[in-house]
């Protein structure tokens, strides 16, 4: 779909983009050429821009911000939720193409003392908003101590086993 939008003239692009459902609009926006993205951003009202930004994953928002002129970046950041704005700024501090610049901050975090059953419930509650749910990061005090997968959790026969015991 993004390729079609990249070929539209400046007058039709915003009109057709506004017809897309919200989630599809965000997915399409991410895949568009920076020139088309900028054209749309300049034509969006603040509320339209906020709707698109709110649907993006942080790393996708960072990719967009990196391609835009400063005045457009300022407008994007002003419409982003405070938490997203903070995450965007954190990722932008890393050198381009470094591990930090391509990482995602939207993942499922589990505590080592959680049970498998609690972990599955947490994934169900929070996973919808995460970009990565297949690998779960086990943390203690915001420090990574290990990994486990959704597969490991689902195949564990003891729902009362701790995450620490299966990672």
Write out the residue ranges for each language-model feature.
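Hydrophobic packing positions in regular secondary-structure scaffolds
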Residues: 1-167
